[in-house]
């Protein structure tokens, strides 16, 4: 079970890094917000889901 939590945290860190880099680049690029809005919202939803799933799985570990 511990390896699952470690894997989830690793995925969360990688995904967070991608969002931290990708979202400001999207905002800084002219016209990209309209094209990438759905992708950013989807990414934020996936990130939120990862946080909740990681917390839920972690609650089963002593």
Swiss-Prot record:
Source species, domain of life: Eukaryota
Keyword entries, A-Z: Chloroplast, Membrane, Photosynthesis, Photosystem II, Plastid, Reaction center, Thylakoid, Transmembrane, Transmembrane helix
Main location: plastid
Biological processes annotated in GO: photosynthesis; photosystem II stabilization
Claim: Plastid is one of the keywords in the record: yes
Record membrane topology: Multi-pass membrane protein
Parts of the chain that traverse the membrane: 8-28, 41-61
The protein's name: Photosystem II reaction center protein Z
Species this chain originates from: Gracilaria tenuistipitata var. liui
Lineage, highest ranks first: Eukaryota, Rhodophyta, Florideophyceae, Rhodymeniophycidae, Gracilariales
